[in-house]
């Protein structure tokens, strides 16, 4: 099942899943509070909607679920954080603005309603096309309900050495660069060049194999990518800017 979290308890379960994936499985460095609570939490959680994929056939096996008199709950196996422009504007802006200069893109598209996608993760055994399709179906329903014109966000490649990621970064730079008016540039202090290999040195097939499933999914749907990558040392990742105007979404994905 895919739906929005409706209670604080469900948001906490999404935060626990994020902690498991980002901190325990990958190499993110938790703050003391995150390590204590075993949840990935930040100020944006309070102003975002949280999309959940729930497996009703599986139940939580955490100590919390085995307390006397507490009902066993279906397992949250995937999540996405959704931030609408009106919520961002009335609080502290988009999370992405901490890595990319998105103001020129916003100015080039006056009146467009933007939705930021972030903090996406899926529990390891569920990293299948089916789960990605469920998340996409949930996002697409949300986009239609709120009349969103374009989606934006940061997508991550694992690792903090851009030279080891030269092939996928160069592929995105040469073959999937956002058009003028939709292309955000990494902030000057954080800018890492993506064109580490010449266009003719990029083997597209090998590059696609080196990309994480989420970025491959974005490419399939019709997303394009910004100018420059950003190294996020806390999360142990190299981030790229992704943008997807609704008008650019491949027709076959609109029918979900």
Cite the ranges covered by each PLM segment:
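Helix-loop element at the rim of GNAT/NAT acetyltransferase active sites that forms part
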Residues: 17-31
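Short, His- and charge-rich active-site/binding loops that engage polyanionic ligands
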Residues: 47-106
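Acyl-donor binding region in acyl/amide transferases
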Residues: 84-224, 229-238
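C-terminal "cap" of GNAT-fold acetyltransferases
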Residues: 236-249
